[in-house]
């Protein structure tokens, strides 16, 4: 009887410890995945900001070109 309780207690203790280890491994993996995703989000944010600046420069160039065309069209109408 005592031996059965001892073996049962050892099995429960071992399974609890193994479950704890696997949970820690999963938590570590998830933490690593989150860090990787955060790095990718930061990179994408930087890329969006760079593209945003390029788009604004293209808009400014287009506005200047349109203004020059408007000025030329007005010169021909006179």
Curated annotation (Swiss-Prot):
Sequence repeats lie at residues 24-34, 38-48. Residues 1-20 form the signal peptide. This is Major outer membrane lipoprotein Lpp. Homotrimer. A lipid is attached at residue 21 (N-palmitoyl cysteine). It is a lipid-anchor; Peptidoglycan-anchor. It comes from the Bacteria. The keyword ATP-binding does not apply. Keywords: Cell outer membrane, Cell wall, Coiled coil, Lipoprotein, Membrane, Palmitate, Peptidoglycan-anchor, Repeat, Secreted, Signal. Belongs to the Lpp family. The modification N6-murein peptidoglycan lysine is found at residue 78. It comes from Yersinia pestis. GO terms for biological process: lipid modification; periplasmic space organization. GO terms for cellular component: cell outer membrane; extracellular region. Disulfide bonds: none annotated.
């Amino acid at each position: 009887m005592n031996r059965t309780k001892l073996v049962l207690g050892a099995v429960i203790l071992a399974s609890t410890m193994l479950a704890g280890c696997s949970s820690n491994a999963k938590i570590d993996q998830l933490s690593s995945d989150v860090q990787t995703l955060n790095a990718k989000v930061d990179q994408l944010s930087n890329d969006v900001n760079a593209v945003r600046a390029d788009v604004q420069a293209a808009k400014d160039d287009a506005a200047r070109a349109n203004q020059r065309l408007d000025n030329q069209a007005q010169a021909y109408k006179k």
